[in-house]
Design a protein with these regions (language model features):
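Proline-rich intrinsically disordered, low-complexity coils
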Residues: 30, 35, 46, 56, ...
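N-terminal ordered "arm"
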Residues: 1-51
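Long, compositionally biased intrinsically disordered terminal regions
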Residues: 76-187
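A broadly used, surface-exposed interaction patch
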Residues: 45-81
Length: 187
């Protein structure tokens, strides 16, 4: 669909913007969707799924090449992602199942954490970027209603969420560095 194509294009464009040598891993899922995966600059995997498939069912391609063909292709048409870059993919993907919903975190909280973290990274970082210790700092803990299964969320994950455009305001628009906090829902 056109919205799936737009989602894929936005995801791939953000990956390419974060890293000019970014690769995208396309992998068919058991539910009939296509998973798009990329390594962010924060050592965090990011993924998006769309309706679709690929042949072969698991392929690694250049993000910029894929962005270029997605930008000009009509919805519903097959795209050729170009040459495969299997050797450019580092590591394995996480399991396809076994996850549970633990809690919802308000978008405003994530944005405030990202902005505070960015400010601290600018003052405490170096020419090489933020210190690893800062990125690995737990900035939020989420847990189920019964208090079990606490999940520690580190700053690098918060940065990856915002850099990949996964945080939206109350109207569904992407939150940026200049977005007003009042436009982001409290809950």
């Amino acid at each position: 669909s056109a919205s799936d194509r737009a989602d894929a294009l936005a995801f791939v464009a953000r990956a390419a913007r974060m890293n000019e040598a970014a690769v995208i891993r396309l992998q068919g899922r058991p539910d009939g969707r296509l998973g798009l995966w990329t390594h962010t600059g924060f050592d965090v995997l990011a993924t998006r799924s769309i309706v679709g498939g690929s042949a072969p069912a698991d392929i690694v391609c250049d993000a910029e090449q894929l962005r270029t063909v997605l930008a000009v292709a009509d919805a519903g048409t097959r795209v050729d992602p170009g040459f495969t870059f299997a050797s450019a993919w580092k590591g394995a993907l996480p399991p396809a199942s076994g996850y549970v919903h633990v809690d919802d975190v308000p978008a405003r909280s994530v944005v405030e954490l990202a902005r505070s973290g960015a400010k601290l990274a600018r003052t405490e970082g170096s020419a090489h970027g933020p210190a690893t210790g800062l990125l690995d700092q737990v900035v939020l803990e989420a847990s189920a209603l019964d208090g079990r299964q606490p999940v520690a969320i580190i700053l690098r994950s918060v940065f990856a969420l915002t850099a990949m455009g996964f945080i939206r305001d109350a109207d569904g628009r992407e939150v940026t560095d200049t977005s007003e906090l009042t436009r982001i829902a409290d809950d």
